[in-house]
Amino acid sequence: MHSWPYTSPMDALIRYFPQVDYSSCWHAMRDLTDHRDAQQSDEFWVLEHPPIFTLGQAGKPEHVLNAGEIPVVNSDRGGQVTYHGPGQTVVYLMLDIKRLGLGSRGLVSAIEQGIIDFLASLGITAVNRDDAPGVYVQGAKIASLGLRIRRGATYHGLAINRDMDLSPWHRINPCGHVDQPMTTLKAQGVDLDRHSMEQQLVSFLAKRLGLTPRTAALPDWYNTRQENVTTGGDPGSALTQQPERL
């Protein structure tokens, strides 16, 4: 994967973050989507979140069984309830789907197939399901999807379980499905370091989407947030609003 000072319309800027809070990412990717133009490159944001449950637009509070100390927020992505936490890689996809020539169904299929291709390269046989977006290994869910399309562009994206603690999943009905088993790469016998795993995943996703990945620096909103944290300021001061908590 290369880092370039210039881009073409079919380049995707890949930004690798450490652990980032959900609110900052959500509002930053929404802001990017609202202000992008037809010449702007697509972006992948690759990161982890601290523990959090998020309810999509179709989410029902009764699918949160026992949140305990883990925050629950309402999100504007599609889908039901999901969990994010350490040991899970999240890839947010800011894509111009008109430029890519994809409808919503084609987009979901391309993302799922990119994940399936990645898992196949590791010797893991995985499938998607018509009745439940995501990627599954012998019935257990290893990757989740949740997208928002606005102004011909997408944000939000996917999450794949690397080596995370699966116990928080028992506190919800994952994506609204009762007793849905979950799994991880590690449980499937794969023990890749995070950076290598993420680079490989991005490569397969970009190929399925017809994009060329170009590694890029972290964005200004993240650097500003880090400065606020370091100086004792409000890390959310650059955000327009906080998500609604349940």
Swiss-Prot record:
GO terms for cellular component: cytoplasm. CDD domains: LipB (cd16444). It is found in: Cytoplasm. This is Octanoyltransferase. Pathway: Protein modification; protein lipoylation via endogenous pathway; protein N(6)-(lipoyl)lysine from octanoyl-[acyl-carrier-protein]: step 1/2. Its main location: cytoplasm. Its EC number is 2.3.1.181. It comes from Alcanivorax borkumensis (strain ATCC 700651 / DSM 11573 / NCIMB 13689 / SK2). Keywords: Acyltransferase, Cytoplasm, Transferase. GO terms for molecular function: lipoyl(octanoyl) transferase activity. The keyword Acyltransferase applies. Catalyzes the transfer of endogenously produced octanoic acid from octanoyl-acyl-carrier-protein onto the lipoyl domains of lipoate-dependent enzymes. Lipoyl-ACP can also act as a substrate although octanoyl-ACP is likely to be the physiological substrate. Residues 38-213 form the BPL/LPL catalytic domain. The lineage of its organism: Bacteria, Pseudomonadati, Pseudomonadota, Gammaproteobacteria, Oceanospirillales. The record marks K141 as: Lowers pKa of active site Cys. GO terms for biological process: protein modification process. It catalyses: octanoyl-[ACP] + L-lysyl-[protein] = N(6)-octanoyl-L-lysyl-[protein] + holo-[ACP] + H(+). Disulfide bonds: none annotated. The active site is at C175 (acyl-thioester intermediate). Gene3D superfamilies: Bira Bifunctional Protein, Domain 2. Substrate binds at R77, G78, G79, Q80, V81, T82, Y83, H84, S144, L145, G146, G157, L158, A159. Pfam families: LplA-B_cat. Belongs to the LipB family. NCBIfam families: lipB (TIGR00214), PRK14342.1 (NF010922). In the reaction, the free carboxyl group of octanoic acid is attached via an amide linkage to the epsilon-amino group of a specific lysine residue of lipoyl domains of lipoate-dependent enzymes. Residues 225-246 are annotated as: Disordered.
